[in-house]
A protein has these predicted regions:
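Flexible loop/turn segments at secondary-structure boundaries
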Residues: 116-118, 198-199, 226-229, 262-264, ...
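Thiamine diphosphate
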Residues: 8, 28-190, 212, 366-568, ...
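Intrinsically disordered, glycine-rich low-complexity segments
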Residues: 2-11
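A glycine-rich phosphate-binding loop feature that marks nucleotide/adenosyl-phosphate handling sites
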Residues: 285-292, 340-343, 364-374, 514-518, ...
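Short helix-capping segments at alpha-helix termini
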Residues: 505, 628-633, 685-690
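Peripheral docking tails and interdomain loops at the edges
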Residues: 323, 327, 675-731
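Glycine-rich ThDP/TPP pyrophosphate-binding loop and its adjacent helix/strand module
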Residues: 156-348, 356, 539-660, 665
């Protein structure tokens, strides 16, 4: 029975009928093009097909992929590995992709079923099995990730997490990177997934970005009909993803039988040629099978009928492709047997070796959470200020620092919502320009151009995801999330991707993105969605640096450190502090930096230590003055942490040992707030030095209200801070 290959491009429908594995040499294929109401006849160029050597290479990789799946199934049942998920049924389209794309030139965001593709790109059977046993020598993760999470820096196979759908946005950022690194390159980025993952909103954000920017990005969607147990008609409206994408401009769309190597090769050649010619992104929807269950944790017999499973078996490319090779005279059965024997022997030899491989060494668990080449907590980042000019507000210092760093580092780019001066460049002759809702990025687009400072769609996950892909290529994205209250759509990119990348890849990949976020209340009128804190959620993420300055000088030095360090940084900018007169500073110079993890003792004292940060620093200074006026023999020491992860334990310890009393104050909710961890550590490690219980002041355990009186009741005020300080001093 003939297989139908569909090609949608630019709103029209191109269709052709090809037999399974048919490849008439040098023939022309007639396509019928329907656009609007005017049908036209066009001819496509001669069909490009793999060579005999490529077809033999493809079969070898297909067979090896299936036998590796089978070997892992056996090893899992023997309790010699700990998880197994297969790519069975997907092999044909994957080997076709391996023939079309160029390892170490193109870039790859693979998913867990892409075993055959990874083999074609250069990952070996032994490397895959090292991942299966979780060996220290696993080149993808050093035993830190589940099997089938392939990564290889030399081959440009980027480390993937287990999260489905997050890869698309990173691939979009990666595809964008060539414009900065090598505009003449014809590189293409490939991102793959099953059809189920396209239900994630981040797929649609990535598709929108790819079409907006005409990125050289190829989406290979392998539709095996099921997302675990959910059939495609319950997953995708109409049951066909390609048809849903009709309205996306510049997008080439193709649908192909993904169990047919030759047809898949042709479709992918068209898609890749389109992207290499910089016409825009392409999507190939490959209909494949899944003859094995989702994973060894699943039993497909609980939701697939025998008839369904039998029909899938008939389309299994591992059975069909070798028969076609014989029928076409490409290989005889003896030649097939030689490949089978060689592959089986290679897998067995590799298995024997990896079962003797060492596990990750004890004591290595904390390695590679952060960069081992740039340490932002070191003395290297201690710099004396060289003040010039008039005193500036925090927002002005942040803006000037970004100007200086963009001048210094041509790989630094700034983007986010409303950060550009004006997306319509022609308007700049007549308008002042936006430059951020708080003006922190004003003038960056005008000074450095629209390629280096630009507006993004209103999509927080899209901002962080694209920044990840850009940073993975060596660029330095400094992105803005407009309000902390709206950061949550980006949470998967922040937690599952940005914070974990270096650790999960065993230092193979990194993404030193700086995420600038406006945070906090004390504004009057900000209410629930413009005044919240929640920094403790991000200090709980290993691999992420978290910074929160309280004044203009610190904002300058800490932002510069964030930009120059090699780790992802969450840079929290308190909105109330942007234009306060009391925290202004002269500019300290273009090389002024402040180390992370080094607190500032903003007021010395002998009787009580207060640990705080952000907008509460000034309120605590006011409270301390009141308490000292009422208690003339008392002095209070106030510590501004400045960075929340890491934090300066030594300064806290030294102060508490001196004062014997301590209070932690922050704007966020009291319960499970940032101060709880510090309080617990003080109680555990400094108990013998304490003359009073550890005190804490924070917001009420509710949301910030709109009415100013309500907001004042909810957030910590000077009187709350003073009252708790005096309570502790009475012990």
């Amino acid at each position: 029975m003939a297989e139908r290959v569909l090609d949608w491009e630019g709103g029209g429908i191109l269709s052709a009928v090809r037999g399974p594995y048919s490849r008439p040499p040098g023939s022309l294929i007639n396509y019928e093009l329907e656009t609007m109401a005017t049908p036209t006849r066009v001819q496509a160029p001669a069909e490009v097909t793999p060579t005999r050597e490529q077809l033999i290479q493809a079969y070898r990789a297909m067979y090896m992929a299936r036998r590796l799946d089978d070997k892992e199934v056996l090893l899992k049942r023997q309790n010699r590995i700990f998880f197994q998920i297969s790519g069975a049924g997907h092999e044909a389209v994957q080997v076709a992709a391996g023939l079309v794309f160029r390892p170490a030139h193109d870039w790859f965001y693979l998913y867990y079923r892409d075993r055959a593709l990874a083999l074609m790109l250069g990952v070996t059977a032994e490397q895959m099995l090292l991942g299966s046993v979780g060996a220290a020598d696993d080149p993808a993760s050093g035993g830190r990730q589940m099997p089938s999470h392939w990564a290889n820096r030399e081959l440009n196979i980027v480390s993937r997490s287990s999260a489905t759908g997050t890869q698309y946005l990173q691939a979009a950022g990666c595809a964008q990177a060539y414009r900065y690194l090598n505009p003449e390159s014809d590189e293409v980025t490939l991102v793959t997934s099953g059809e189920g993952a396209t239900s994630e909103g981040e797929f649609w954000e990535a598709m929108n970005a790819a079409c907006l920017e005409s990125l050289p990005l190829v989406f290979l969607i392998q539709d095996n009909g099921y997302a675990i147990s959910v059939p495609v008609e319950k997953q995708t409206a109409g049951g066909n993803l390609a048809q849903l994408l009709t309205g996306f401009p510049n997008l080439k769309r193709l649908e192909v039988d993904g169990t047919d190597v030759v047809a898949s090769y042709g479709a992918l050649m068209e898609a890749v040629a389109y992207a290499r010619q910089r016409k825009g992104p392409a999507l190939v929807l490959a209909k494949v099978t899944r003859p094995y269950s989702h994973s060894l944790s699943d039993d497909e017999r609980s939701y697939k009928t025998k008839a369904e499973r039998d029909a899938e078996a008939e389309r299994d490319p591992i059975l069909r492709f070798p028969e076609w090779l014989v029928s076409e005279g490409i290989l005889d059965r003896q030649g097939l047997q030689v490949i089978v024997h060689e592959v089986d022997q290679e897998i067995q030899n590799a298995t024997d070796r990896v079962l003797r491989a060492d596990p990750p060494p004890k004591g290595s668990a904390l390695q590679f959470l952060y960069s081992d080449s740039v340490n932002p907590t070191s003395a290297e980042f201690e710099a004396e200020p060289h003040f010039t000019g008039e005193a500036r507000t925090m927002v002005d210092e942040l803006n000037l620092t970004m100007h200086e760093e963009m001048r210094r580092n041509s790989r630094m780019i700034v983007f986010g919502e409303d950060v550009a001066d004006c997306s319509r460049e022609a308007n700049l002759a007549e308008v002042k320009g936006k430059g951020g809702v708080f003006k922190t990025t004003a003038g960056l687009q005008i000074k450095f151009g629209s390629d280096r400072c630009f507006n993004s769609p209103l999509a927080e996950a899209g901002i962080i995801g694209r920044a990840l892909g850009l940073a993975e290529r060596g660029l330095k994205p400094v992105v803005e999330i407009q309000f902390f209250d709206y950061i949550w759509p980006a949470m998967m990119q922040l937690r599952a991707e940005l914070a974990t990348l270096r650790w999960r890849s065993n230092n193979g990949f990194s993404a030193p993105v700086v995420v600038r976020v406006a945070i906090g209340g004390y504004l009057n009128g900000g209410a629930i969605y413009h005044s919240q804190c929640g920094e403790v959620i991000f200090t709980h993420l290993p691999g992420l640096r978290v910074v929160m300055p309280s004044n203009a000088l610190d904002a300058c030095g800490l932002l510069r450190t964030a930009i120059r360090c090699d780790d992802p940084v969450m840079f929290l900018e308190h909105k109330r502090l942007y234009r306060e007169p009391y925290n202004r500073s002269q500019h300290p110079g273009p090389d002024f930096t402040i180390p992370f993890g080094k607190a500032s003792v903003v007021k010395s004292g002998q009787n009580l230590t207060v640990v705080t940060y952000g907008a509460v620093v000034q309120k605590m200074l006011q409270a301390a003055l009141q308490v000292e006026q009422r208690n003339p023999d008392t002095t209070i020491e106030v510590i501004d942490l400045r960075t929340l992860s890491p934090y300066d334990w030594e300064t806290i310890r030294t102060s508490v040992e001196k004062t014997s009393r301590v209070m932690i104050a922050h704007e966020d909710c009291l319960s499970w707030g940032y101060g709880a961890e510090i309080a617990a550590r003080i109680a555990s490690e400094l108990f013998e030095h304490l003359d009073a219980p550890v005190g804490r002041v924070g917001a009420l355990d509710t949301w910030v209200g709109y009415n100013p009186q309500l907001e004042n009741e909810i957030l910590p005020q000077v009187e709350n801070l003073a009252a708790e300080a005096e309570r502790l001093l009475q012990f």
